[in-house]
Amino acid sequence: MAFPTVEVLTELVTPVVAQHNMDLEGIRINKAGKKSLVAVSVDSDFRPDLDQLELVSNQISEVFDAGEAAGELSFGAGYTLEVGTPGLDQPLASARRWRRNRHRLVALEVEGKKSVERIGALNDDETAVIVVKRRGKKLVVRSVQLAENTQAVVEIEFAKPAEDELALTALEFDQALDRGEENK
């Protein structure tokens, strides 16, 4: 029996992840004889902590072990199971990831124009997000469409964010747009 495919593992892992109100972001397989790796990436609207990831990892391991014992799966000589969340260096590819990173700085590229701005609220249908940028002493608030031509990666920030920036990113979408119009 061959090493299980990503599709087969996805069918087995998705229900386990869903029990914990998480979403399966992806599965990566690196086959390397005795050192094969199955890396499972999960995410949710809340930030899963290490205890939650350990619980999910243990349950996925139990499902894989049961599949091997029943002869339905074969991981060969052995494998390492790794369960984690997408790293900060991963692009913000879903509305959930934008929502989860609210108040953080983001390196943003929209239609070829690059900038660093702070993430605010999403609109109701999750097709646009508020971003805030400081220009001198002034804060500029704008809406950015979450489209395929929008590239964004969270920036690591060592300094404490300015209170006025956080106040704007804490506002609801329409409130932030109104505040942006007032500041023009």
From Swiss-Prot:
Q: Which domain of life is it from?
A: Bacteria
Main localization is cytoplasm
Q: What InterPro entries does its record include? A: Ribosome_maturation_RimP, RimP_N, RimP_N_sf
Keywords of the record, alphabetical order, are: Cytoplasm, Ribosome biogenesis
Q: Does the keyword Nucleotide-binding apply?
A: no
Compartments in which it is found: Cytoplasm
The UniProt entry's GO biological process terms, in alphabetical order, are:
ribosomal small subunit assembly; translation
CC per GO annotation: cytosol
- What are the TM regions of this chain, as residue ranges? none
Q: Which family does it belong to?
A: Belongs to the RimP family.
Q: Which PANTHER family match?
A: RIBOSOME MATURATION FACTOR RIMP
Q: What does this protein do?
A: Required for maturation of 30S ribosomal subunits.
Among HAMAP family, the record links this protein to: RimP
The protein's name in its UniProt record:
Ribosome maturation factor RimP
**Protein's organism:** Corynebacterium diphtheriae (strain ATCC 700971 / NCTC 13129 / Biotype gravis)
Give the taxonomic lineage as stored in the record. Bacteria, Bacillati, Actinomycetota, Actinomycetes, Mycobacteriales
